[in-house]
């Protein structure tokens, strides 16, 4: 039996990050956590693409996939529940959009888009009290790049 495990050390990987600027107080922290994690593994080929909001993340991710320059793409954002159905529509469509791209792609795409009930939860998940989801999602991306390289 063979077992394959993703490693964090993926030499010379080129990473694309797509981040929504809406809820920028939170998303700046997510980007910082992600880029600091990638820097720990000496990954310097990191490009960050800012989009207005979470809804635009799947489109920009699709554009980056078409460029065929990256070994993996990390998506970051923060959707915070309000008083209307807008939250549910955005969350469902963005998650579906990113998942559909991931399934059709030959490179991994990780989902670091927070969906929270309030700003306090979002700040906690961006590293205020616990781990930074940007960093955690970056680690997941490195593992998936490693696994992808092992099977291809």
Curated annotation (Swiss-Prot):
Cysteine pairs bridged by disulfides in the record: none
Keywords: Riboflavin biosynthesis, Transferase
Protein residues bound to (2S)-2-hydroxy-3-oxobutyl phosphate: 83-84, 125
InterPro entries, per database record: LS, LS/RS, LS/RS_sf
Keyword Oxidoreductase: no
Superkingdom field: Bacteria
Functional summary from the UniProt entry: Catalyzes the formation of 6,7-dimethyl-8-ribityllumazine by condensation of 5-amino-6-(D-ribitylamino)uracil with 3,4-dihydroxy-2-butanone 4-phosphate. This is the penultimate step in the biosynthesis of riboflavin.
Protein name: 6,7-dimethyl-8-ribityllumazine synthase
Species of origin: Limosilactobacillus reuteri (strain DSM 20016) (Lactobacillus reuteri)
Lineage: Bacteria, Bacillati, Bacillota, Bacilli, Lactobacillales
